[in-house]
């Protein structure tokens, strides 16, 4: 296990011990990380991973902790949050963004530079790293449509670049998940557009999101993947599950595809409610819902 003294001499690194992850997750649930680290440079991240490897320390890397539930027992070993790796650069029609850059901010950079194609992501919570990891998407667009390459690091600290085809994108899936890689940055190829039209489209999508999604409460975003031929929210509605609550977490009355933390709920409440919804939807429609949200950590 990595020791505090192992981390003291790594520059550009903030470290916290026994830190509640509920302070950082969008759901506002999650037990403590043994060690929580915030590298501000690629060099700091590299050194951190090398130290973890040499001390046989388990590593969990998080982007912006949005489409995620951390269990109440927390996460053992080292947890790395990439939120300080947030630079965004523009060159011609290409945007390169580091893993910790927020999607919303990257879409604003695209608009300011008259680049279109990234509008779909303007309301998706979370970071570039997390979005690439799960091929995030909304309103007919997804990351795989605009990504041209991705810089990644393995657990030994080796850096490589994957092309879009090497990313093996699927629905809410990429090779990053399979190979335990860390996203460092991603390059996106966009097209020339009119900044006013781009902003109008982003305004339209944000209005749709705000009118349909329960943004007033903590949540993990969309809980379930879209089943083939169906909509998860519609199936949940048809099973009369809207408003059903376990502990402090309920199926949103505004959008059945969301579960919101309305009364200081915990991760156990989320897991129980997810299991309950899966059972009842299966019973009502015969369709088995598959969670889109990642659930990690110890109970």
UniProtKB/Swiss-Prot annotation:
GO terms for molecular function: FAD binding; UDP-N-acetylmuramate dehydrogenase activity. InterPro entries: FAD-bd_PCMH, FAD-bd_PCMH-like_sf, FAD-bd_PCMH_sub1, FAD-bd_PCMH_sub2, MurB, MurB_C, MurB_C_sf, Oxid_FAD_bind_N. GO terms for biological process: cell division; cell wall organization; peptidoglycan biosynthetic process; regulation of cell shape. It is found in: Cytoplasm. Pfam families: FAD_binding_4 (PF01565), MurB_C (PF02873). It catalyses: UDP-N-acetyl-alpha-D-muramate + NADP(+) = UDP-N-acetyl-3-O-(1-carboxyvinyl)-alpha-D-glucosamine + NADPH + H(+). Its cofactor is FAD. One of its GO terms (cellular component) is cytosol. HAMAP family: MurB (MF_00037). Cell wall formation. This is UDP-N-acetylenolpyruvoylglucosamine reductase.
